[in-house]
């Protein structure tokens, strides 16, 4: 099973919103991934498109998958 370390979060639009008011999201990734916890990380929609910043709140490894819960702390928007 592969193991990867990351300094940014790339959602590929597969995130699920857990809590609206707290801007909490969950992302499930194949394989085992390691992220810094409770540090601000850049958040990307794809490899090229940065959409904001997030803080990892919880990280779980189970059955060859990584579950990442993060809080969106800033959003880059042109609206």
Which stretches of residues belong to each language-model region?
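Short, solvent-exposed secondary-structure boundary/capping segments
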Residues: 62-73
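Short alpha-helix capping/helix-loop boundary micro-motifs
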Residues: 24-31
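Short, basic/aromatic beta-hairpin or loop at an interaction surface
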Residues: 5-24
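Short beta-strand-centered aromatic/proline hotspots
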Residues: 49-60
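Short, well-ordered loop/turn sites that connect or cap secondary structure elements
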Residues: 34-37
């Amino acid at each position: 099973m592969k193991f990867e370390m990351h300094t940014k979060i790339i959602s590929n639009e597969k995130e699920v919103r857990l809590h609206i008011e707290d801007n909490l999201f969950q992302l499930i990734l194949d394989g085992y991934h390691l992220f810094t916890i409770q540090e601000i990380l850049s958040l990307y929609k794809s490899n090229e498109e940065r959409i904001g910043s997030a803080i990892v709140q919880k990280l779980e490894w189970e059955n060859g998958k990584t579950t990442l819960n993060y809080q969106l702390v800033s959003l880059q928007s042109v609206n």
